Amino acid sequence: MAAKDVKFGIDARNKMLRGVNVLADAVKVTLGPKGRNVVLDKSFGAPVITKDGVSVAREIELEDKFENMGAQMVKEVASKANDAAGDGTTTATVLAQAIIAEGLKAVAAGMNPMDLKRGIDKAVVGAVEELKKLSVPCSDTKAIAQVGTISANSDETVGTLIAQAMEKVGKEGVITVEEGTGLEDELDVVEGMQFDRGYLSPYFINKPETGTAELENPFILLVDKKVSNIRELLPVLEGVAKANKPLLIIAEDVEGEALATLVVNNMRGIVKVAAVKAPGFGDRRKAMLQDIAILTNGTVISEEIGMELEKATLEDLGQAKRVVINKDTTTIIDGLGEQEAISGRVAQIRQQIEDATSDYDREKLQERVAKLAGGVAVIKVGAATEVEMKEKRARVDDALHATRAAVEEGVVAGGGTALVRVANALREMTGDNEEQTVGIRVALRAMEAPMRQIVANAGEEPSVVVNDVKAGQGNYGYNAATEAYGDMIEMGILDPTKVTRSALQFAASIAGLMITTEAMVTDLPKDEKMDLGAAGGMGGMGGMGGMM
């Protein structure tokens, strides 16, 4: 086991604080509408230019191991805020730095760190309650666009695109961000249920100009097994032919004789038909087939529940207004399912989302809800260069998360105003003893730090602005973009309550742990001389050239 280097008390805390300051100082220059860029060197390719706090934090690794521990703990604050709300990483870092710096001063003055931490925790609980009181619901398109704009660093086109996407696919809809091919940002909305399985044979194509198979008012047969024997399909095919409607078959697979017969029937015009594989695998496939059945008012033909394909009738088939199939995807538009059944299914999946333990499962379940309830929107980010594309995509992702958070828990006045109001409301709060009260004061003073940093980045004097805002009431704050005072919500400067709350809670949590740190342990650096000494005896090999 390698020897360890141990530091105690004030030495340990000072080293840790130095690391915190290096990371936080690099991150906080990006805060606010007039925040600066940070350039990150990459081992290959062009440097990355970013205004995204968490991207800057992730790149920072310090040489001194004790300082690095401090930096890594604050990096954790940014990551946690990013995971919880998708934004607010820079705010969380600024808050953490302020609480740690003030807290360590109090510890150096001889205060009990545990009581300080209790005071900080008490202030945060009170602050979260105050934030809830200040929060305003965010439901209209204009407010959603404003939140998106602020989070995308005042890029109005991004805010508007996200608002349009949410309007089209609903609050629950899936919105994904992709890299586009042009210079302009685009919004692509897929209505209805789309899954990533294409036609099983190109002979099903009936629109050669678009390379798609399109079926109008089709019956939809859902089968939870492989179909290879055409005899099993004959009763359904005959019924569909009599009804003079097209047929879509969604099965685990359709192969051999069954597929060949379907192709021949389709080409001869006897029955207009197309076949695709069912989406997903294993239990997820069964669940998704059931989703499609509910959406189209059909029944999944499954031997597990004693149903045989040969005995299927037209009553077992689902129906939709239209189905479009290309080589990669199938889209079912306007399924004829009953709204009540669809709502029940959505509620059931939402319950599963709450119980899910892994992010992957949660994401897949969320997609299923979106496909049943709304649709899927794709925002294609346009840019002139690769470097700009990466930077812009990160901003759009942030903005999307922020708008989701805003819809979830509402919005508060932006620009750090809400936290200043909260600190003002709690100024009479006291702890169980004097040291807890000092902890409360540390947290309340730190709540002014985001506004101070936004103002400093805009080139103004932070103390003057903070005092002016404190003198005001409600949503009165300072708009750093226009250098004007006024009602922040009316000016469209909004922050999602969830983002502000998460930033404060995570910052206080990690800062509290760091204030109560008394010792730090790390590996001693290895002695390089020893390693070189072992190879020293090889020096004489140079003379072997004469032996050739």
From Swiss-Prot:
Cell compartments where the protein resides: Cytoplasm
Annotated GO biological process: protein refolding
Alphabetized InterPro entries for the sequence: Chaperonin_Cpn60_CS, Cpn60/GroEL, Cpn60/GroEL/TCP-1, GroEL-like_apical_dom_sf, GROEL-like_equatorial_sf, TCP-1-like_intermed_sf
Catalytic reaction annotation: ATP + H2O + a folded polypeptide = ADP + phosphate + an unfolded polypeptide
Binding positions (ATP): 30-33, 51, 87-91, 415, 479-481, 495
Record's keyword terms, sorted: ATP-binding, Chaperone, Cytoplasm, Isomerase, Nucleotide-binding
Assigned EC number: 5.6.1.7
GO molecular function: ATP binding; ATP-dependent protein folding chaperone; isomerase activity; unfolded protein binding
Record-linked Pfam families: Cpn60_TCP1 (PF00118)
Cited PROSITE patterns: CHAPERONINS_CPN60
Domain of life the protein comes from: Bacteria
Transmembrane segments: none
GO cellular component entries: cytoplasm
Gene3D superfamilies per the UniProt record, alphabetical: GroEL, GroEL-like equatorial domain, TCP-1-like chaperonin intermediate domain
Assembly and interaction partners: Forms a cylinder of 14 subunits composed of two heptameric rings stacked back-to-back. Interacts with the co-chaperonin GroES.
Function: Together with its co-chaperonin GroES, plays an essential role in assisting protein folding. The GroEL-GroES system forms a nano-cage that allows encapsulation of the non-native substrate proteins and provides a physical environment optimized to promote and accelerate protein folding.
Family affiliation: Belongs to the chaperonin (HSP60) family.
Protein name per Swiss-Prot or TrEMBL: Chaperonin GroEL
Organism whose genome encodes this protein: Proteus mirabilis (strain HI4320)
